[in-house]
Amino acid sequence: MTIKTDVLIIGSGAAGLTAALNLAESHKVAVIAKGALGDSASARAQGGIAAVLEEGDSFEAHVNDTMIAGAGLNDVYVVEHVVEAAPRAIGHLIDLGVPFASENGALHLTR
């Protein structure tokens, strides 16, 4: 079987599918995965997405926690960017219809 595409994305995790969604507006995109599209490490992680979404939480705390979890090997500028972009990314995923866990009509937030 031959498939013609502008962009081939290998992997159906969060990064691959985000790239596919963004590129699909202007390119013909194909996604391939070694298993079912929903069978990625991202889908199996079930740990949620770390983001500052409520009062009393802070970007600084998330950056610090991430740096500690990464044994200080993380690029602090990348960590800061990801933490700052996370609330917008979650909003975008909600707009796309991603079914996040919720309680009483609000996102389920855990610590």
Residue ranges and their predicted role:
Residues K34-R111:
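Conserved N-terminal/central alpha/beta ligand/cofactor-binding core
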